[in-house]
UniProtKB/Swiss-Prot annotation:
Ubiquitinated via 'Lys-29'- and 'Lys-48'-linked ubiquitination by UBE3C, promoting its degradation. Deubiquitination by ZRANB1/TRABID promotes its stabilization, leading to autophagosome maturation. The gene is Pik3c3. Its cofactor is Mn(2+). This is Phosphatidylinositol 3-kinase catalytic subunit type 3. Residues 759-780 are annotated as: Activation loop. The modification Phosphothreonine is found at residue 163. Residues 605-871 form the PI3K/PI4K catalytic domain.
Length: 887
């Protein structure tokens, strides 16, 4: 092989010098702007575009790879031009050959002066530094310039310099390739012919450039020569072909931090200086300016879940004396206190007595797990003493849960020592029996009956317990003392605590909490035994209730064991209820109904008892009341009703809050009571599922016209019934949205003949739903048509009621959030899934970040989204078919 046929090359990684690039000339004409552009931007008239001679252009050059710059740009030096742009200048780029990646490209932008201190791009072009075979470019290249844009260094680039979009560019590209082949020795060199050929090539290129609408920038890349031999630069990376291990799975590496969990000395020093006792006298008379006052008002208005920043805590502490006149600010102040510092805690407790008394509903926050100081918790109990029995009953379920955050030793120490007493000779409390806690049946604590009595004492005549006026009561003592004064409170306190005592999950997971509830029940039993005759009657009636429920559970188990179909089980149920010798349920001494103790019952009517069509077959029972009437209930065995009990309690509370604002939305908060983790009572409301209404009557309006016709009312329906329907729809739409009630279909929406619509079956709450893509609220086409359609007056009234209800409930959001915060450790299925997110889920539904006006617009969007939810309609049809095939 001859010397001329050899290919000489050098690796790019071995050439440790900077890349150089020569900027040659710029060919082509710049297109002038239109007169309209000059009128809109008069500065154009003074730019280089309108100079008589060639304007003073300059070129910047920058290397890119993968869309990122590898170095700073460099530019040509100043040069004055007369007839053509010709820099003829070598630029030394701040990048060396070994540092160039395979996909490196150089971006060239031509700039023109545009006013003082500014420039505009004439055009840009980009070219890769390595060819498709990995050879570094050499020699001269004519690059197409894209007008009025900067060179694009991304990959792929939007300003390619080497392109063949037209026939003329194809011709120039073909000639450039032939020139390159001649330079590399792939053609026979004939001097006289070469000179003629190159001259002709230059003429063709000049002609093509002139006829083209684009400008062309000529650049030249360095050629490497050694010993009169030309070398090509081949891209090569040392050790680039070696395989490198790739981790298919990551591994966490734990790096020990010696300062982790250690005290931050700077923060501690700042905290001590900010809370110094020396600043107390000066803080006493401190008043905030307007800006600070607004900031304090914002902090006070925060929801109870909001964590205060260190700056906000310091601000509240600084103006603590000023805030003592604001009852809403007390909880925020107590959050600022570091209770581990004795002096700071002492200051806070001294100020607690001087603070303006907080509202009863706000004091519930102080009973949550976040407040462990016993004085603070007893202050909350002292505020609860101001609540009447009706309000206390609304919070009782949560207050029983709040016992989990009390001092268990204090509750245990409240038990009286074991001793025989003449008053208890007929029935000793379990604590005197010597039975160990592990062998305790919680229902036996209070089911040792006294001699029977004719009727329970009126709540107003119950004698006050001696410690009832004690301002230092803990929560347990307070609840027991109030229950001893009111038979209704005693009824619900007993059943709420009984359920906690019988909770097997708590017994296994947290034995101390289980033991605490047993001690609460013992103390309750002792308090009832210590009272006068009327108080001891309460204990006797609670024991009778427990016996009655136990017999009913025994009966339901016997019915469930019965083989055969539902009809046969119904017959067995009625037969057992009628057998007074075995069950003694149809004729009993007068006792309060556990579900609603104001109702006194004499037994169950056997002939009317029936079982529902469902897997667990709950029983519908009719109780004989004291006045000879009937009270229908549903008794469920094998089902945990605590979640339904919570939701109905919150709905009942919301109904009371709305009525307080003179807004009666005709809600139906039927009563639910869990008497165990496996059984309980539900009030039965005579009603028809909406699905059945649509099947039998065709529409909701037809149903109303059948049972409440009126010639003068809207659509031939009684105006009162239509008003009730519209209001109840609005109330439940807003409430079920806030509580995140899921699994809504027309079988668990019920309708009464008086127009009340209400929801049942709250197995999915807080955003959980077995169906995909549920709408924000259950509001389908059939329900809207029941109001007369989206254009009707009733539908507009429905929307108005939704807005009003939502705004009112937002104002009571703190109370509702406090109640849910006390339930986070309750064994309620949908809360136990994510207890730390429970309160946040409810808070998010209130949208407290919005103003009232914004909240109304937000509710509008929710209603519109729910009405037009197409997927929800499809799911409803699927559910309808599924129910059909089950039947």
């Amino acid at each position: 092989m001859g010397e001329a046929e050899k290919f000489h090359y050098i690796y790019s990684c071995d050439l440790d010098i900077n890349v150089q690039l020569k900027i040659g000339s710029l060919e082509g004409k710049r297109e002038q702007k239109s007169y309209k552009a000059v009128l809109e931007d008069p500065m154009l008239k003074f730019s280089g575009l309108y100079q008589e001679t060639c304007s003073d252009l300059y070129v910047t050059c920058q290397v890119f790879a993968e869309g990122k710059p590898l170095a700073l740009p460099v530019r040509t030096s100043y040069k004055a031009f007369s007839t053509r742009w010709n820099w003829n200048e070598w630029l030394k780029l701040p990048v060396k050959y070994p540092d160039l990646p395979r996909n490196a490209q150089v971006a060239l932008t031509i700039w023109d002066v545009y006013g003082p201190g500014s420039a505009v791009p004439v055009g840009g072009t980009t070219v890769s530094l390595f060819g498709k075979y990995g050879m570094f470019r050499q020699g001269m290249h004519d690059l197409k310039v894209w007008p009025n844009v900067e060179a694009d260094g991304s990959e792929p680039t939007r300003t390619p310099g080497r392109t063949s979009s037209t026939l003329s560019e194809d011709q120039m590209s073909r000639l450039a390739k032939l020139t390159k082949a001649h330079r590399q020795g792939h053609m026979v060199k004939v001097d006289w012919l070469d000179r003629l050929t190159f001259r002709e090539i230059e003429m063709i290129n000049e002609s093509e450039k002139r006829s083209s609408n684009f400008m062309y920038l000529m650049v030249e890349f360095r050629c490497v020569k050694c010993d009169d031999k030309e070398y090509g630069i081949v891209y090569y990376e040392k050790d680039g072909d070696e395989s490198s291990p790739i981790l298919t799975s990551f591994e966490l590496v734990k790096v020990p931090d010696p300062q982790m969990s250690m005290e931050n000395l700077v923060e501690s020093k700042h905290h001590k200086l900010a809370r110094s006792l020396r600043s107390g006298p000066s803080d006493h008379d401190l008043k905030p300016n307007a800006t600070t006052r607004d900031q304090l008002n914002i902090i006070v208005s925060y929801p109870p879940t909001k964590q205060l920043t260190y700056e906000e805590q310091d601000l509240v502490w600084k103006f603590r004396y000023y805030l003592t006149n604001q009852e809403k600010a007390l909880t925020k102040f107590l959050k600022c206190v570091n209770w581990d510092l004795p002096q700071e805690a002492k200051q806070a407790l001294e100020l607690l007595g001087k603070w303006k008394p907080m509202d009863v509903e706000d004091s519930l926050e102080l009973l949550s797990s976040h407040y462990t100081n016993p004085t603070v918790r007893r202050y909350a109990v002292a505020r609860l003493r101001q609540a009447d029995d009706e309000d206390l009953l609304m919070y009782l379920l949560q207050l029983v849960q709040a016992l989990k955050y009390e001092n268990f030793d204090d509750i245990k120490n409240g038990l009286e020592p074991t001793k025989k007493d003449s008053q208890t000779s007929a029935s000793e409390s379990l604590s005197n029996s010597g039975v160990s806690s592990g062998d305790i049946d919680s229902s036996q604590i209070i089911t040792n009956p006294l001699p029977p009595v004719a009727s329970p004492p009126p709540a107003s005549k119950a004698k006050e317990v001696s410690d009832g006026e004690n301002l230092e009561q803990d929560l347990c003592t307070f609840l027991i003392s109030r229950a001893c004064k009111n038979s209704t409170l005693a009824n619900y306190l007993y059943w709420y605590v009984i359920v906690e005592c019988e909770d097997q999950d708590t017994q296994q997971r947290d034995p101390k909490t289980h033991e605490m509830y047993l001690n609460v029940m013992r103390r309750f039993s002792q308090a009832l035994l210590k009272g006068d005759k009327s108080v001891r009657v309460m204990r006797s009636l609670l024991a009778a209730q427990q016996t009655f429920v136990d017999r009913l559970v025994h009966l339901m188990k016997a019915v469930q064991r019965e083989s055969g179909n539902r009809k046969k089980k119904n017959e067995r149920l009625q037969a057992l209820l009628g057998d007074n010798e075995k069950m003694n349920l149809s004729d009993v001494e007068l006792i309060p109904l556990p579900l609603e103790p104001q109702v006194k019952i004499r037994g169950i009517i056997p002939e009317t008892a029936t079982l529902f069509k469902s897997a667990l077959m709950p029983a519908q029972l009719f109780f004989k009341t004291e006045d000879g009437g009937k009270y229908p209930v549903i008794f469920k065995h094998g089902d945990d009703l605590r979640q339904d009990q919570l939701i109905l309690q919150i709905i009942s509370l919301m109904d009371k809050l709305l009525r307080k604002e003179n807004l009666d939305l005709k809600l139906t908060p039927y009563k639910v009571l869990a008497t165990s983790t496996k059984h309980g009572f539900m009030q039965f409301i005579q009603s028809v599922p909406v699905a059945e209404v649509l099947d039998t009557e065709g529409s909701i309006q037809n149903f109303f016209r059948k049972y409440a016709p009126s010639e003068t009312g809207p659509y031939g329906i009684s105006a009162e019934v239509m008003d009730t329907y519209v209001k109840s729809c609005a109330g439940y739409c807003v409430i079920t949205y806030i509580l995140g009630v899921g699994d809504r279909h027309l079988d668990n929406l019920l309708l009464t003949k008086t127009g009340k619509l209400f929801h049942i079956d709250f197995g999915y709450i807080l955003g959980r739903d077995p169906k995909p893509l549920p709408p924000p609220m259950k509001l389908n086409k059939e329900m809207v048509e029941g109001m007369g359609g989206t254009q009707s007056e009733q539908y507009q009234e429905f929307r108005k009621q939704c807005y009003t209800a939502f705004l009112h409930l937002r104002r009571y959001s703190n109370l509702i959030l406090n109640l849910f915060s006390l339930m986070v450790d309750a064994n309620i299925p949908d809360i136990a899934l994510e207890p730390d997110k429970t309160v946040k889920k409810v808070q998010d539904k209130f949208r407290l970040d919005l103003s009232d006006e914004e909240a109304v617009h937000y509710m509008q969007s929710l209603i519109d989204e729910s009405v037009h939810a197409l997927f929800a309609a499809v799911v409803e049809q699927i559910h309808k078919f599924a129910q059909y095939w089950r039947k």
